Amino acid sequence: MLEREEIVPNVGDFHCIEYLGAKLLIARGDDEKVRVFANTCRHRGASLKEGSGNCKKFRCPYHFWTYGLDGQLIVAPNFTDSNGEALINDSNKEEYGLAEVESGTWGGFIFVRLGEDTQTLTQHLGSFVDALASHKLEDMRCARKVVYDMDANWKCFIENYVDLYHIPYVHKDSLARWKTTEYHQTKPHGHER
């Protein structure tokens, strides 16, 4: 999970984020679809945007290559060979669009896949979709976001956070009365609840 869709509620809204070492650009296109791109120009790799905002297109500050909200290259000004011929034209322009990161939305959340996987988002979520359907996650909004920086491997931290088995032993003076067996379940696809 990358973010909530509400981070880019309107056409032209964008939000830059670093996720697992990748600099990403979340954008809502003219078709109202949320897309995620590598936040780098395809020419020399300059960052396209910083922070959050709204725009009609993405323009690289270095050579002014300009992209649509759908990531397609609009123009690469004066990008010619020694004879003055355009190196990018209608026949190859689509090869120079922004690098789109595979993404999908569900329940108001934006998910990305940075690695190789053959499952679709729906397949990956499995029975989780039905289990949470009654909560109407797509209608919820983030009221407060808290970010913790820690000197730890995030996977170890999350594993400990979802591991309720240790609570009666490690937290015996504070949380031991909580019946963790009533709450903790491991579901298919590795989802914890």
What are these regions (language model features)?
Residues 1-6:
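Extracytoplasmic c-type cytochrome modules immediately beyond a signal peptide or single-pass transmembrane anchor
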Residues 8-116, 123-126:
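Rieske [2Fe-2S] iron-sulfur-binding domain
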Residues 33, 104-105, 109-193:
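C-terminal catalytic domain of Rieske-type non-heme iron oxygenases
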